[in-house]
Amino acid sequence: MIHETAQIHPSAVIEGDVTIEANVSVGPFSYISGNVTIGEGTEVMSHVVIKGDTIIGKDNRIFSFAIIGEESQDKKYGGEATKVVVGDRNFIRESVQIHRGTVQDRGVTTVGNDNLLCVNVHIAHDCIVGSNIIMGNNATLAGHVTIEDYAIVSALSPVHQFCTVGAHSFIGGASVVVQDVPPFVMAQGNHCKPFGINIEGLKRRGFEKPEIHAIRRAYKALYRNGNTLEEAKEEIKTEIEAFPVLQGFLDLFEKSTRGIIR
């Protein structure tokens, strides 16, 4: 179904069970095929490919040569019915690739709301990308990666399979992330190492001074006081009631399978 207010360029190809909602525009030579839904107000520019079982929300801007919903680059993938779900108000720049999930995981790759995915960003199968995230040019996520809200992954930085990049963290340019990055932490290098707290980012997002000081103490417990990980956990737990924002540290410690950058 194509809504009467949608604007489809004559050279665009649309086939299969495609739903295009109100005020969507589709540019020249774009190809949309399969069980695809494109939400109201989304702009699809020229030469975009959207395939498979893919849901795209409202008011997104999808730039030329982006590919969304292609099969995963996982050799175990055997054509199963898996999907991509993209939220609202994302900027998906030129040549971004977002691949479908696999049945070995959740079967879906998800991107939240209000993200900026810069040129040549790659989001592999089964990734969970939250909201208000920035990924710089050529940043790449291997399969099963989680990027939490407000994180920044700078240009040319790859993230290893099954890693988590915590909320409000900052990954410097050309870094290689092979273990989990706790929330609020700045990290850089090959392999990625911690370099303090993302203070400027926290200030911009309205964190109060007492919260920032508590986050600093948690960072010191983890990295500066000579603690084991278990000792750091216990030290952070003593402040959870007063500063619930620290719960993100404990949540990451519990679910980590790759280990924490140290």
Curated annotation (Swiss-Prot):
Its EC number is 2.3.1.129. Keywords: Acyltransferase, Cytoplasm, Lipid A biosynthesis, Lipid biosynthesis, Lipid metabolism, Repeat, Transferase. Involved in the biosynthesis of lipid A, a phosphorylated glycolipid that anchors the lipopolysaccharide to the outer membrane of the cell. Pfam families: Acetyltransf_11, Hexapep. Belongs to the transferase hexapeptide repeat family. LpxA subfamily. This is Acyl-[acyl-carrier-protein]--UDP-N-acetylglucosamine O-acyltransferase. HAMAP family: LpxA. PANTHER family: ACYL-[ACYL-CARRIER-PROTEIN]--UDP-N-ACETYLGLUCOSAMINE O-ACYLTRANSFERASE (PTHR43480), ACYL-[ACYL-CARRIER-PROTEIN]--UDP-N-ACETYLGLUCOSAMINE O-ACYLTRANSFERASE, MITOCHONDRIAL-RELATED (PTHR43480:SF1). It catalyses: a (3R)-hydroxyacyl-[ACP] + UDP-N-acetyl-alpha-D-glucosamine = a UDP-3-O-[(3R)-3-hydroxyacyl]-N-acetyl-alpha-D-glucosamine + holo-[ACP]. Pathway: Glycolipid biosynthesis; lipid IV(A) biosynthesis; lipid IV(A) from (3R)-3-hydroxytetradecanoyl-[acyl-carrier-protein] and UDP-N-acetyl-alpha-D-glucosamine: step 1/6. InterPro entries: Acetyltransf_C, Acetyltransf_C_sf, Hexapep, Lipid_A_LpxA, Trimer_LpxA-like_sf. One of its GO terms (biological process) is lipid A biosynthetic process. The keyword Magnesium does not apply. GO terms for molecular function: acyl-[acyl-carrier-protein]-UDP-N-acetylglucosamine O-acyltransferase activity. The keyword Ligase does not apply. It is an enzyme of class 2 (transferase).
